[in-house]
């Protein structure tokens, strides 16, 4: 019989009462048991409360990946407050803009005084001795989390979850095993890794974290901790796949039952490679936003029957494809993806710093373009703002990037549109490679995958990865930087 829903804070304590020594979190050479997580979060909660944090508040958490990050989140929930994670490496200007927008009661991860009179505690903070670890009154956070926008727009935006922080600690979700071990190698300030790590911990499992993703290191952690569930973005899957075959073969990853790919559409060739390697029953993909309006999921088995798809809507969530006039697109025609949660518009989130894009009858869009097949499977094209119109033809950068990354020497890439006096826009590819590759070699490779008008007119080499740790591209920032330096292409 399922347990009644309990608050996240109570779930941490309930699990600690049953198996106190069982590991809840592993990071690098450190670990944290259920009992340690419970006691530490009780002390932190009291220290945070002494600095003004209370039920209903937002608390900004700007800590790097690690045990301290999750302990801080648990402490915030035990106060009935809402964690609002941000990157610990954000430039000061960007971080200040987010803090101003969130107006948190407390900032965790910065030195006191960093934001004037706003209370804050630094990384490595130790609660004062008077703050004990005895149990706290049970309080439910009315908002489970407040995630910062992924950054693709370049403007700070908070997505406040309207669902309260409650769970059943005897129910695992997303195909996880109850009490299993999950690898969450991405940055915890992004929704996917954050939700994944906590789904695991709050259902009695062990979350294995990484400071920064490393392909060989990820395989070593899967073997060492007998990981059965892992969350990867396509960039991580690409880096693992690009390891020498003999390197991949050194690691025993037979305990891995599910790989969930999310964050960006996985290139078809890469998805097929992983299916061939581990089997279709283990390779899954999910699509959705932090807004949780709707989402899709697809197994490897279904993907083989619908290659390139990101799946069908989950639960009672709905989606439709609309053209620019707001009319429903025929099957197979690209349009904007609109979604509706079971509770209707406004039932899952609210924005701080932005407005939802919605139809008059409440269907919302995150700005993605895609199409549906006759079985209701969704296929993504790209983001609407990233589409490039070349001589009147629509080109989706993600398609060109997937073709470029199919070259074994291409580590990462980004394709953007730049002004062109003849075609209106031209395609420009920014490429990080493992070895020297001429423009002609790249064009020859692309001719095997794309029609001529989708092949970039110009190429640029860079030595640093173009995607962040969560696999996100800021195409708008890349485009803006090149516009300043190049301007329109002369005729």
Language-model region placement:
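Conserved AMP-binding/adenylate-forming core of the ANL superfamily
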Residues: 21-52, 60-66, 91, 95-96
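Conserved ATP/PPi-binding loop(s) of AMP-dependent carboxylate-activating enzymes
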Residues: 313-316, 327-359, 393-395, 437
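Gly/Ser/Thr-rich phosphate-binding loop
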Residues: 202, 228-229, 245-306, 318
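Conserved beta-loop-beta connector loops within the AMP-binding
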Residues: 318-338, 371-375, 435-439, 473-474
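AMP-binding/adenylate-forming catalytic core of the ANL superfamily
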Residues: 46, 230, 367-454, 466, ...
